Amino acid sequence: MKKVESMNVVPFIDIMLVLLVIVLTTASFVQTSKLPISIPQVDKDSTDSKDVLDKKQVTIAISNKGSFYFDDKEISFENLKHKVSTLAKDTPIVLQGDKKSNLDNFIKVVDLLQTNNLKQLYILVEDKKNQKN
């Protein structure tokens, strides 16, 4: 009988590559902003953060001090109105609001988006299950 000198690792490497492909295709890669905003949390599992859009998305953020940000750049509400009016109607908008921000500012932005007929609005929230205690 012939003695086996070394273990064949090719099947192990094949399995690991398949697992790597599965993990990379199912993972949700959403880049969050670098702004100091504390995102509200929800209990639901059905958040649509996995729907990463193919088109160029625009991020509008509201800080807890009432400042507005358009794609990570601070902007006045009047300039925000102008920028939003130039967007295409099918542009996806990601709205980030600090959980301590004024609700009035949030409603102003939503009203501005509705006035400009921008329907693809995504509100960024954090799942409570993912929070570390």
From Swiss-Prot:
Membrane topology qualifier: Single-pass type II membrane protein
Gene Ontology CC: plasma membrane
Pfam families: ExbD
Transmembrane regions: 10-30
Cytoplasmic side: 1-9
One GO-annotated biological process of the protein: protein transport
GO molecular function annotations of the record: transmembrane transporter activity
Residue spans, topological domain Periplasmic: 31-133
Superkingdom field: Bacteria
Alphabetical UniProt keywords: Cell inner membrane, Cell membrane, Membrane, Protein transport, Transmembrane, Transmembrane helix, Transport
Localization (cell): Cell inner membrane
Gene3D superfamilies reported for this sequence: 3.30.420.270
Protein family according to the UniProt entry: Belongs to the ExbD/TolR family.
Protein name per UniProt: Putative biopolymer transport protein ExbD-like 2
Species of provenance: Helicobacter pylori (strain ATCC 700392 / 26695) (Campylobacter pylori)
